[in-house]
Swiss-Prot record:
Sequence segments annotated as region (Disordered): 914-944
Family: Belongs to the alpha-ketoglutarate dehydrogenase family.
InterPro entries: 2oxoglutarate_DH_E1, 2oxoglutarate_DH_E1_bac, DH_E1, KGD_C_sf, ODO-1/KGD_C, THDP-binding, Transketolase-like_Pyr-bd
Compositional bias (Basic and acidic residues): 925-936
Organism in which the protein naturally occurs: Bacillus subtilis (strain 168)
Role description: E1 component of the 2-oxoglutarate dehydrogenase (OGDH) complex which catalyzes the decarboxylation of 2-oxoglutarate, the first step in the conversion of 2-oxoglutarate to succinyl-CoA and CO(2).
Cofactor(s), names only, from the UniProt record: thiamine diphosphate
Name of this protein: 2-oxoglutarate dehydrogenase E1 component
Amino acid sequence: MFQNSMKQRMNWEDFYGPNLGYALELYDQYTQDPNSIDPDLKEMFDELGAPPSDIKEASGTKEKGRVTADLIQKIASAVRLAEDIRTYGHLNASVNPLRKDEKKSELFPLSDYGLTEEEIKAIPASVICKDAPKNISNGLEAIQYLRNTYKRTISFEFDHVHDFKEREWLTRKIESGELFQKNSAEKLSAVLERLTEVEGFEQFLHRTFVGQKRFSIEGLDALVPVLDDIIAQSVKSGTTSVNIGMAHRGRLNVLAHVLGKPYEIIFSEFQHAPNKDLVPSEGSIGISYGWTGDVKYHLGANRELQDAETKSARITLANNPSHLEFINPIVEGSTRAAQETRTQSGYPVQDETKSLAILIHGDAAFPGEGIVAETLNLSSLKGYQVGGAIHIIANNMIGFTTESAESRSTKYASDLAKGYEIPIVHVNADDPEACLSAVKFAVEYRKTFNKDFLIDLIGYRRYGHNEMDEPSTTQPMLYDAVRKHPTVKQIFAEKLVKEGVVTEEVVQNIEKSVTKRIEDAYQKVPSKKEHTACEIELPEPVSNGFPDVDTSIDFDVLRKLNGELINWPESFNVFGKLKRILERRAKAFDDDRKVEWSLAESLAFASILKDGTPIRLTGQDSERGTFAQRNLVLHDSETGKEFVPLHHLSDCSTSFAVHNSPLSEGSVLGFEYGYNVHSPETLVLWEAQYGDFANAAQVYFDQFISAGRAKWGQKSGLVMLLPHGYEGQGPEHSSGRIERFLQLAAENNWTVANLTSAAQYFHILRRQAKMLLREEIRPLVIMTPKSLLRNPNTVSEVQELSESRFQPVYEQSGLSHDYEKVTRLVLSSGKVSIDISDHFNKLEDGKEWLHIARIEQLYPFPAKGVKELFAKLPNLKEIVWVQEEPQNMGAWGYISPYLTEIAPEGVSVQYIGRRRRSSPAEGDPTVHKKEQERIVSDSLTRKN
């Protein structure tokens, strides 16, 4: 890049600082051996001569003069010194509030660079620091200015940022002094008042609710004014939605002061008192609880900001379990949804200004939890980037009882961010003004480059991990220092009084006012004895189950949609083999009238889009499909250009997004869940490459998707597609662990399906789309096929799409209707049902005693349909549940109590399948085949 820049500019006036220093070093090499450097550089030096080295030449005059090698070396050394200060100055900064008086040896003495004060004074300031203030007149002053700039109570790391323009911008912002402009007295007074509120709230809780967990913010009080300022600056720039993710540390304070959750509601949660009569005291706030609820320091909130300063914006603090950092991709997904407009065909239109993600991390969790790296990896990806998130490490330098040296292998908690070229600011949490400078830097960088930025807010933890902890047990010296250390409010108030910004009387009046507001709020809280326990009841729409939904669609509409799905521009060159496959789909409505799985999916998507519902589908290889079945995105075989037929449906004004995801389950599933929660009108689907890999995202299934509504009242209609089925591919490519989803199934929290026909898949997708904005909506887990994608026994008649609807219980076709002869009912779900069907159809006679049915929807259990099936079979003797999974896996453990409970009197319920195993499947395909044959044979063979 340097050579190209030189060749284009051909003028020394444009070179300064490190660029000029580099040029001087190369020129020194050139004078010793002209052929030892790049030919382009040699040509440059031949034409322009030496780079400027004295004041006149550096100022742009055309005076000529020979430059000695020694002078070149001195200038190069001075420039290298300046670069070292920029790169390593943070090592000398005063960012640890508990070590503010620690004396540090001066880094980078002139002697280490072979320089004296006189020599460096002779070098122009602009050579060393182009953006220094005008009062900096020479190289020595420039070096001292850089030392002071890079070792304050705020320090900077951006040497890992590779983009030249970004580095130049970052350098200019820091060295011009723009970040450190004095704040107005009004703003400083407001920050003091906020810090007084933060401290007063925590101290009141500490006195009033002795020993109760609250995960105090004390030691990092500045986090609240930092959030205030990020929100205010962003909203002034046009942001209308701010999404915040954080763990429990300091959460109650953020809820009270950033989200405006009334003190009295928080107090009532400590008091375990009813709060239904408490009315928010400021702003407009919405807080939703589920029927089982959650602890107070996990709850989220929404707030509508309405004032002249910040215009109008919705602030959301996401609900969060104690699983640290897992909220991060959820917040980013919500932010992406808020940024996108989905009311036009094609991909959604993204406006990154509309919404901002703020992610608050812990200093132990940021390097410790892998989900952090997974989420950072999304930051520049087409389907996931949010125009830059602002990260804040709430760094109290300890994780529970574990100190930094035990919790990470890096110097800073923030070092992971370097791998993603995220600029980093370390700032002392005891210096609120430095914190405001960090905010200004972060907001302006994001606005300029639409990239992530990280603030490492370094403070301490005044008490233990929770308020029942005694931290001196494990950190006696640290907590001796903490006890002696004044609060940030005390430090800041003293500073402002000393500077004449406020008087001591003003400080006292602020304290009295804050104390009164808090105590007045407490008086509104009913006493604990008024609280009466009551039985938890499900909301009626949830307890009533899924309503019957008409998902049929007119045959002619389907035919037209199919034609549009196989239509592309004449000049577009579809890959030959794929073209033949796609063109065969036309026959579905002309000749054979059969629809295979992937066509049923495309038709479902097309019809849902035409109905006005946006769709977002992501996953590893989801554009093509893991098994080359989907091909939603066509690639021109000659130009590589892309074409998406679903973007070109006639009379469609709804967006369709499909994205290949990174190789990550957790962050991607979390992102899609967040997108869906924020955009409930959108059909959001996440597809695992194989269902086996879904457990890499287990936290999201356990803590959010299955339980989010019960805990927080947080509805979701997310669809999860998990390829599942035993085909001899070994223990890592066979099982989506359906047993885990069924174990989590309760209170109609989601739907779990294991389907065997294209029509069933078509209808369940359409049913989900039609339910999205209804109270009855819930997530949908589908065990999708692999080899069955092309199995002729899974294809459906077109009429099954146009005239039917989803059937939770699906009877085998071709059965005898002499129900009185039936003594065994074979029930199964998923791929093994097709294996049973194949074997059954090969039986020549002796089949009258058998009846076969598939349970397509496992949860909620279709008791009504199964009972109706039993009623048809008056002489039934046994019900066998057949599965290909081991007995301790699959659906058996879940379904056997249901079947036993509703089975007719005297009818046994039996199991046929693999025995109990620790591994889900055999590694040897031959052994697999024998086991599969045994299972199918046993299910269709009469006992002796």
